[in-house]
């Protein structure tokens, strides 16, 4: 007897938005009204090519009726996060699980290792000498640089075979000069995540204590400088400068990638999970009323952020994860209304543990982004004056409305980089934008004086 279409394709749902630390038992509790096939074995988590959780999973159920029950859980919450549930099938599940994760065909046995702790100015010749006797493929070395063109102290090396790469791993903790070198198994996919720098970092850098506005990197400019140009050309010390050969693709199941082969669904999920990549946060708001946080303690949890905004009640918290799997110190917080997001800005420059936290508003009144009630805004500013370290200043002007510039000079580049400097007024007025730039510049000059 032939199986029905449902029988051949199985009874599967796909879950998105899971907490990073979520376990199979927690997924089973979330679907407690549904019969999951084979218990915890029926929960199939999706991992990135670096082996980190993607926040997604497939769940195998026992019948079509169980699938219908599971779909009713769409947009319900797990902890403080709402979870999306989609109908899927066994074909999609098998394909995705095969082509993702650290053991996928795209990452296994490609002979890559990653070095960390290289001396400043370490050359390719020194690395070749370090691996003397182990064959490195032609043009098989990549030396990443940061967004200012400086060496990161890391390198990626591709050997002629996986067996040679295993031998290279045995040199872990040996020295180059006075520095001991850490060596880790890597993959072509990891090289790609380092190949093109995060756009958010290229367009906005928090000034250092000795920085001065100048050519290519002023506080109020978006100058790109030599570091940007080196990275734009793929100048990672040579190496894999021709990654256009690995053109972007979309597999039809939502696992798209850019032209460097980086996953667009993860990200730094994070990173974009960059961020945590992705040319900025991968956070997608459902209400359009968000506050971006910067300067969080690296051990801050979602609960810490909920408590930080108490008595306000955020709908969702998304802590950014960088491409190295570490938190970036930034997060996006979603509120139900524009008024709640505005009220949350009263916490700008407040401390969380030992660090003060900067807040950037990303919300407009109404769906059309029309002008907000200025009497309310002025009342809010007056009620919070002095408490926020002067982060707002007197910037209700021109077509920009209110722009939340930060207190260290108000870099206007934030308004271009990640969209966190949005105002309440219509932002199509370039004259208003220019006026904000001019005021920021004059404010900064007066601060220097």
Curated annotation (Swiss-Prot):
Which keywords belong to this entry? Acetylation, Isopeptide bond, Methylation, Nucleus, Phosphoprotein, Repeat, Ribonucleoprotein, RNA-binding, Ubl conjugation
Q: Under the cellular component aspect of Gene Ontology, which terms does the record hold? A: nucleoplasm; postsynaptic density; ribonucleoprotein complex
GO terms of biological process kind: regulation of RNA splicing
Q: Where is this region: 2 X 19 AA perfect repeats?
A: 354-392
Domain called RRM: residue spans: 11-90, 111-188, 289-364
Positions of modified residues (Dimethylated arginine)? 233
Q: Which domain of life is it from?
A: Eukaryota
**Protein name, UniProt field:** Heterogeneous nuclear ribonucleoprotein H2
- Organism of derivation: Rattus norvegicus (Rat)
């Amino acid at each position: 007897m032939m199986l029905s279409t449902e029988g051949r394709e199985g009874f599967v749902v796909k879950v998105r938005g899971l907490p990073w630390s979520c376990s199979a038992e927690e997924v089973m509790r979330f679907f407690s009204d549904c019969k999951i096939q084979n218990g915890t074995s029926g929960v199939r988590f999706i991992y990135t090519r670096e082996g980190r959780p993607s926040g997604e999973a497939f769940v195998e159920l026992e019948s079509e009726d169980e699938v219908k029950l599971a779909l009713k859980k769409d947009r319900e919450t797990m902890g403080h996060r709402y979870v999306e549930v989609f109908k899927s099938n066994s074909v999609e599940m098998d394909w995705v699980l095969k082509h993702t994760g650290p053991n996928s065909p795209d990452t296994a046995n490609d002979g890559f290792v990653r070095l960390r702790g290289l001396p400043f100015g370490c050359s390719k010749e020194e690395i070749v000498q370090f691996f003397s006797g182990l064959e490195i493929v032609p043009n098989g070395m990549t030396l990443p640089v940061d967004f200012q063109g400086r060496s990161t102290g890391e390198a990626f090396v591709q050997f002629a075979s996986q067996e040679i790469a295993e031998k290279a791993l045995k040199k872990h903790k040996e020295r180059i000069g006075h520095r001991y070198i850490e060596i880790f198994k890597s993959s072509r996919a990891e090289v790609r995540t380092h190949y093109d720098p995060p756009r958010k970092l290229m367009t906005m850098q928090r000034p250092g204590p000795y920085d001065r506005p100048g050519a290519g990197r002023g506080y109020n400019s978006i100058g790109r400088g030599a570091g940007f140009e080196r990275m734009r050309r793929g100048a990672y010390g040579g190496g894999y400068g021709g990654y256009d050969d690995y053109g972007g693709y979309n597999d039809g199941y939502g696992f798209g990638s850019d032209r460097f082969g980086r996953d667009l669904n993860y990200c730094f999920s994070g990173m974009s999970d960059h961020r945590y990549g992705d040319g900025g946060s991968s956070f997608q708001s459902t209400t359009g009323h968000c506050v971006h946080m910067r300067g969080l303690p690296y051990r801050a949890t979602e609960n810490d952020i909920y408590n930080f905004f108490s008595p306000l009640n955020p709908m969702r918290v998304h802590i950014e994860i960088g491409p190295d799997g570490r938190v970036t110190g930034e997060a996006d917080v979603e509120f139900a209304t524009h008024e709640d997001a505005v009220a949350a800005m009263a916490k700008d420059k407040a401390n969380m543990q030992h660090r003060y936290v900067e807040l950037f508003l990303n919300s407009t009144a109404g769906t059309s982004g029309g002008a907000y009630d200025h009497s309310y805004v002025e009342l809010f500013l007056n009620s919070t004056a002095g408490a926020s370290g002067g982060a707002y200043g007197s910037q209700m002007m021109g077509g920009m409305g209110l722009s939340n510039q930060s207190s260290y000079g108000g870099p206007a580049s934030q308004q271009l980089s990640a969209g966190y400097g949005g105002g309440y007024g219509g932002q199509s007025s370039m004259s208003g934008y220019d006026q904000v730039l001019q005021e920021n510049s004059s404010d900064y000059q007066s601060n220097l004086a």
